[in-house]
Curated annotation (Swiss-Prot):
Its cofactor is heme b. The gene is MT-CYB. This is Cytochrome b. It comes from Myotis pruinosus. Heme b b562 binds at H83, H182. Belongs to the cytochrome b family. The chain crosses the membrane at residues 33-53, 77-98, 113-133, 178-198, 226-246, 288-308, 320-340, 347-367.
Amino acid sequence: MTNIRKSHPLMKIINNSFIDLPAPSNISSWWNFGSLLGICLALQILTGLFLAMHYTSDTATAFNSVTHICRDVNYGWILRYLHANGASMFFICLYLHVGRGLYYGSYMYMETWNIGVILLFAVMATAFMGYVLPWGQMSFWGATVITNLLSAIPYIGTNLVEWIWGGFSVDKATLTRFFAFHFLLPFIIAAMVMVHLLFLHETGSNNPTGIPSNADMIPFHPYYTINDILGLLLMIMTLLMLVLFSPDMLGDPDNYTPANPLSTPPHIKPEWYFLFAYAILRSIPNKLGGVLALVLSILILIIIPLLHTSKQRSMSFRPLSQCLFWLLTADLLTLTWIGGQPVEHPYILIGQLASILYFSIIIIFMPLTSLMENHLLKW
């Protein structure tokens, strides 16, 4: 008799995706982040579902309903902080996952990569709308500033912004629709994750050498299931440390003040995981230019496979490209720091230089360095 996991139509899909899946024998812990992202998504959907049972998306009661969740609902405080800090863990894993793809040349799997970029946009949109829901000062002003950027689009901009707002300012209609979309998008993301995996399993995983590993594959279970469980334990431990010891470390104190359209906070800034893009936006003194740079800072990932000029797929054996990769990482950390600083003398210039460097490394220096390394191979 055939094993049920190999014969049952549903079990067969699970078996071929997580149990008998052939995986390269040499993939490192950098390949853990895919499974961690799946767990983050599941955690966010679960905690979000329970929060939605007690939340009210009305401007008069939204802030108080979040307070009520934290004070009166059984274990409501842990749900709220797991959800808020879970988003931070989600983005840490996302950025490391994308960084791994860049370093090891995983972007050569075009379909998987492109769906991944769309997923990144979808997760960023979901996180932005979620930040508006507690209806604190930073929620309100963040929503006002970011949605208002669309008014920079020529001809249709103003109409588009008012259409998104559902009125002439961020108000009840905006909050209600943001809640609706914030609830809906994670399920669309979950469906897109399935497509992401479908395309990945068509080609199989990449590995640190960048060389096809068809000759040396091992089953996913038990080798990588146990590896993923270790990563999961480390992530859960980090998340619980955050939630139980310093739940507000990554948040903004201004969001504990109820939204007030009549008083602007001294420094309007998004959550930490958007600060690098926010710094790029602010570094251009033109509204439309800033918006374009903001979108392109993420959209540039789409063209990375076209900029690959090296004869080798991975950066494992390309020391010059490695130097550029870590320079790019340092540059992104610099942009993240600048995004949280006020718009004044030294920070403006640092932000502009870091923004120019960001695009230059990706579009100019990396392809040229790869060509140079190709030439060095002939020596």
